[in-house]
Amino acid sequence: MNDRYSGTFYKVTTRDEIHHGFSYQDGENVLIEPFAEEGSCCSGGLYFTDKTNLHNFLSYGVWIREITLPLNDERLKVVADPSGDKYRANILIFGKRYSLLDPDTFTKFDLPMSRCYQKLQEYITSNETDVEAYENAFKTSHGARIIFDVLKEKSAVESHGDVTIKFLLENSASVAVLVYGKERV
């Protein structure tokens, strides 16, 4: 197999890690249907991307999964998607999982959302909020809940206009399910 496919790749997954009916799991994931050698964004493959293009897929879910390919497995088939920002394979190995609600994830992967957290902190500071409480919250398991509550503030979105904040607001029901375990009204 080509060295191009050695190393670590990534996939953004939903909370339940099901995409187009395929249920992903830790470890080996094998495509059930026939593999599509040609086409773009088509069925017949398990899609993944590299670190350079990861930011293009942040709206696809709430987890980033590390992906490796079983290069010594004779069953493995891989193609680069014609779009240039993703790949398709019939076998993916799922490794570590990182939450997109954790600011450290964005720092680790050098993703644009790190600017969002900076803007949120600037917004909190400029509005005479208890900055220390928010800073502590960003470091705790309850940080996502507080971030969610701040993101609901229309003025934060209007002043900063971050695309990711807008996405989170537009999809607040799914964010609430992840953060609270149920939809909030």
Task: Give residue ranges: language-model regions.
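ADP-ribose/NAD+-binding catalytic cleft of ART/PARP-like enzymes
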Residues: M1-S43, S59
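Conserved NAD+-utilizing ADP-ribose enzyme module
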Residues: M1-S6, C42-G44, H55-I64, T68-V185
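A helicase ATPase "motif cassette" and its flanking acidic/Ser/Thr-rich regulatory loops
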Residues: D50
